[in-house]
Amino acid sequence: MSVTTSFGIWLNHINLDNQASFLYNNPHFCNRRFNRISMLRTVSLARNRLRSETPSSFLARDRLRSKTPSSSPFSSKRHTPKTSEIEEESTPKDSVLLNPKDPSSAPKLFLVQPRLAPPKYLQAKLNEALCLANSLEEQRYGYFESDFFDKELPSHVVVQNPVRRSSKPRVDTYFGSGTVDNIKCHLNAEDSKEEVDAVFVNAILTAIQQRNLERIWAKPVLDRVGLIIEIFNAHAHTKEAKLQAELAALMYNKSRLVRVRGTDGRHTFGQFGEAEVVSARGRAGSKGTGGGFVGGAGETELQLQRRRISDRRIRLLSQIKEAQRTRLLQRAGRKKRVGLEGESSGTIAVVGYTNAGKSTLISALTKTALYCNERLFATLDPTLKSAHLPSGNFVLLSDTVGFISDLPIQLVKAFQSTLEEVVEADLLLHVVDSTAPNIEEHRSTVLHVLNQIGVPEEKLQNMIEVWNKIDYEEDEVEEEKYLDDGEGVGEEDEDEADLKAEETVDASEATVDEDQIQNGDGDDADGWLLSEDENADDPEFWKVPEVAKVDAANKKGPDVRVSALTGVGLKELLYLIDDKMKEKKLKSPTIVERSELHKRKWRPPRNDDEEERLIPLDQR
């Protein structure tokens, strides 16, 4: 102990004694708020605190004050450290910085595509994943900074699919150790260019797999569902779309509340990723108390964040219900106007796979400038436009959100209020991209989602299937004429050779003992993550049900082939819609026109006895 520190402590003792004796001998200072007993207790506690503070305790206290507190998105702002204090602290090795390196531009993702067979199907899935990665961009001042086709393709790598090798992927990292190291080498090469903000794995990962991959790669990791939610948040413009996108994010993030290693937790990625926080043993354990409880309520951090997410979800559902009520009133008003002065013949919902050309087709049929974009999920709100039919009537065409494969039912339920326009429509128009190599999968996905939201079977049987983009299909046929007959020979053999090579690399560490992982005995094991809540990371929660098989006997082919850009087949489509609406009107003869209702005068119903009693006796 230095002389200066000892002298300071001794001087504080003298000042404290003088103040105590002065207050004790002058009762005028002991007013109604402070009596002598409370004053003596205060002096005694102050002395004990001063004696316990040695120079080492002063240094320890200074270190604690200079440390950055544990970050929590739901913590109060007054406990948030300043930016200068955060920059002074060195970033831990396990922490992940999820902020884009260039805030003015869209996040740049690195795509990891599991290998699929046959190669044509792999190419289709790879193209869809690249479009998803490039679609993650938010509009600035009402428009995107660059055209979709002018953007560079994201860096990507095709790796071994663990589902093909075994019936079950690894429970800790999804991929084998050799594949994980291979991806890390690619990331290190891309980091030299400083072009990667996050890693997009085109598969559905559990919370533990996502956390372990983030720690190994030192990069944020987004799976297929997480990226789709981010795109929903970026493309939502109206109030209802933003509410539904936030609801989908909350339902997804509630299952991602798992504990991370490190006192600082980790930053988040995206608009609503802040719901993912340090959980379970949380704040009380990080403060050195050794317990897993917060305050005196006995509530863990995991339970606290779940309760807050549930409360927010209830508020969102109430606001969405108000918007749903408004749509219900609008639909009721449209139905009342059906048949009045030939105003409308009904409503037609245009459904289909994402980026199938639904908005472009509606713009061509209605001769309006509807918003169209090549990005996936460009339309999130239903938009009504009127189209004139050859019979002289006109119908309302409703543009809806596009569907996509491997989408859990939880996300479909988040957009239930918007998809009610599809259920309540008089006729369905299914738009199919004729250039898609996996066109049967697109058709099956759309039919499966329609069954999930409760579309009646009668509407599905009466649905019109339109194959769009036939102009691109003709261009592809012309290009195939000039292809070399020997081109492509041996590609499958090369893929099989690469597959065997990757299996050889991962053979030593491909299989993982699940009991060892759950007990936390392995090096990369995170079984302790499941100790607090096993249901939160249950893969069955976000498991995508099998797509319903399409009955080929019901659909022999498309009802009509069109090109929304060139206008080919649009007239034939309008005639087909007119015939369908006439058939629907003939099948519903009990519908009474509104003009006749106004001419009637309501009278209470009478039975036969009352009618007989009202007839005069001489006329019976």
Swiss-Prot record:
Q: Return the InterPro entries for the record.
A: G_HFLX_dom (IPR030394), GTP-bd (IPR006073), GTP-bd_M (IPR032305), GTPase_HflX (IPR016496), GTPase_HflX_N (IPR025121), GTPase_HflX_N_sf (IPR042108), P-loop_NTPase (IPR027417)
Which Gene Ontology molecular function entries are recorded, alphabetically?
GTP binding; metal ion binding
Disulphide bond pairs: none
Q: Which Pfam family is one of those matched by this entry?
A: MMR_HSR1
In this chain, GTP is annotated as bound at 352-359, 377-381, 399-402, 468-471, 563-565
Where along the chain is composition biased (Acidic residues)? 478-497, 511-521
The cofactor required is: Mg(2+)
Domain named Hflx-type G: residues: 346-585
* Cellular compartment(s): Plastid, Chloroplast
Give the UniProt family note. Belongs to the TRAFAC class OBG-HflX-like GTPase superfamily. HflX GTPase family.
Query: What is this protein's name?
Result: GTP-binding protein At3g49725, chloroplastic
Organism, by scientific name, is Arabidopsis thaliana (Mouse-ear cress)
